[in-house]
Structure formats: C-alpha cells, structure tokens
C-alpha cells in the first residue's frame, strides 16, 4: 500500500519470515526515488498481511489482516511511518480477511471484509463492519454478512480507487489457484454475490 504523508512516500507491505512462514507489516521509504530496505513496523506473534491504512479525524490508522488471531486488530500511527500502537481488538472469534474502507457516514468508517468457506478457503463471502467513536473510545459495530453465497471473487485486492468513477479492486481466484487475477469494477455497481460489470479486462 503506497502512502504519502509529511513529505514522505512509503510503501506498507507484508514481510514474511521464510523460516516460520509468519508475516509482519513492514515499511519501505521511496521518498528519494529508490527503494529502501523494508523495516518491520508492526510485529505480533501471529501472521499479519494486507496493511490497510486510512485517515480518521486527522489521525492515521491501519487495519491489517490478522485472521490468524481470530480478531480485527486496529493500530494507530504515533510517528509516521515507523511507530505504531495498538488502538483496539474487535470482533473476537471472527476470521475476517482483507478489510477495505468502503464508505464514511457521519464520521463512521464502514469496511468490507471477507470470511472463508470452512470447507474451502479459496471461497469467500463478504462481511461488513463499522468503526464508531463514542465517549472518547473506538467501538466496532458488526453490520453482518453482505452476501450469503461463497464465491471465488468475494474478496478485495486493494483499497477503493477514488477517482471520477470510483473503482473497487476485486481479487479473483480459481479452484486451487489463489489470486489468479484482479478485476476493476465500478464501485456503485459492484454488488457482492451478483454479476459484476468489468471495467478493465482481467
């Protein structure tokens, strides 16, 4: 995930320890026009991936994939881009992956994530939740399943591209091949579990 702040351009990414197979969130500074060695910025005793950053009330947050912890783990940036702190653990017992900021309503942040089919984790279905601020605390409200059917393309591949025509980036898999391709869809026409209108060829 590319992010620009305070005159710096950085890339947040998953860095995997090949010995353990466990990933952490790392950051590579590209401000000077070349790629610096990624530095770990968030490490936990469980696998992490898919760093999703978003700004909320003048603060930078990240919600990486922490499905192995069976919870949503939210982090706040204390000093950009290398220092982060835990901001809350939510929806314990859920195994949700690849959260993407979908919309903002009255200061609340709505996310679209995916849950696995317990019989085959190549198949997923969408689940939504919302972060709210109340009494100085961040609370999470479960908005429930958005689609009932497990499919091979009910999983986001990156943040919504906010342009004249906002685009949702959808990951497509095939049986036995994870992340076979991606698909760009008009956000307002994208209805999980239904036929998706393609903007660009896969």
Regions found by a protein language model. Name each.
Residues 1-202:
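Carbohydrate-active catalytic/glycan-binding domains of CAZyme proteins
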